[in-house]
A protein has these predicted regions:
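Active-site loop/oxyanion-hole signature of alpha/beta-hydrolase fold enzymes
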Residues: 53-99, 274
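Conserved HGGG/HGGXW glycine-rich cap/lid loop of the alpha/beta-hydrolase fold
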Residues: 5-65, 69
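Flexible "cap/lid" loop of the alpha/beta hydrolase fold
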Residues: 118-158
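Short beta-strand/loop motif that positions the catalytic acidic residue
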Residues: 223, 229-231
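Catalytic active-site module of serine/aspartate enzymes centered on a nucleophile-bearing elbow/loop
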Residues: 252-282
Length: 282
């Protein structure tokens, strides 16, 4: 295993590699989360691939000092390209989860010739409209007791208190709990919340204009790389836009992982690993 920092777009970006074999860049979700929730689950894949994790700009162990003019989707894409160049890989297999799937799509649109295989796992929708529809459906899965607790956390100022980190983590876990096929699996999700989470969230607020109106559907035709679209059985996207998204990608296939939700690598690791390995080996 190797870990450290590299200067990317003038900012310190934390990265970690493990395993040997073809490189697989792993793009985490969020925004404002980091790579750590993939572990230890992804260590299984390190037996056959070189996994490249990194904390996105202003996330996790990466620097919060970012040029505000580049705090947009294009900036996240450029970060990946610089990471690829600095690590010396001609091409990358790219795995994007959730919010990371949106970044992965944007990267593949811009740098399709640098992508060997693309995996869009539980990805944000390719358009703001579809993303908003999915969020509305997903919100219906939060049970009444958890919703009451979320309301308390948000309405009583706990998120703005000096000791906000435990409440931020609790809020996220309650939200992600509703996105599990089996709510008990939330105990297997490891989240790291930095002490300066609020400041990092404020930096991500600069993404507002990009996330409010984006629509990638027309540009998905530019992605010629083999693409695997993965969703969990209980995700709203399966019945909303999964088919539409797959049809917009010229060289893609859709797989739905049974008995899983937004985190199939946690809930159904056997089927998840089988799908990923089979796809990358084709």
């Amino acid at each position: 295993m190797e870990e450290g920092y590299m200067i990317v777009n003038g900012s310190d970006v934390y990265y970690k590699t493990m395993g040997e074999g073809e490189p697989l860049l792993v793009i985490h979700g969020g925004p404002v989360l980091d790579h750590s929730y993939f572990l230890p689950h992804f260590e299984r894949l390190a037996k056959d691939y070189q996994l490249i994790f990194y904390d996105q700009r202003a996330c996790g162990k990466s620097s919060i000092e970012i040029d505000s003019a580049t705090m947009n989707l294009a900036g996240f894409v450029d970060d990946i390209e610089q990471i690829r160049q600095k690590l010396g890989h001609e091409k990358l297999n790219v795995y994007g989860h959730s919010w990371g799937g949106l970044i992965a799509m944007k990267y593949a649109i811009a740098y399709d010739d640098k992508v060997d295989h693309l995996i869009l796992s539980n990805s944000m929708a390719p358009s703001a409209v579809d993303w908003q529809k999915e969020n509305l459906e997903a919100a219906k899965n939060i049970n009444a007791a958890d919703q009451r607790r979320l309301d308390v956390i948000v309405s009583t100022g706990l998120l703005r208190s000096a000791n906000a980190v435990p409440y931020i983590k609790e809020m996220m876990l309650l939200s992600f709990k509703s996105q599990m096929f089996d709510a008990r699996n939330i105990n297997k999700l490891n989240l790291f919340i930095p002490e300066d989470f609020q400041q990092r969230s404020a930096v991500f607020g600069l993404l507002g204009p990009d996330l409010g109106t984006y629509d990638l559907y027309a540009d998905l035709s530019k992605i010629k790389s083999p693409t695997l679209v993965l969703f969990g059985q209980s995700e709203a996207a399966v019945n909303l836009h999964a088919q539409k998204m797959t049809k917009a990608l010229p060289n893609s296939r859709l797989e739905v992982i049974k008995n899983s939700g937004h985190f199939p690598f946690i809930e159904n690791p056997t089927e998840f690993d089988k799908s990923v390995r089979s796809f990358l080996n084709q």
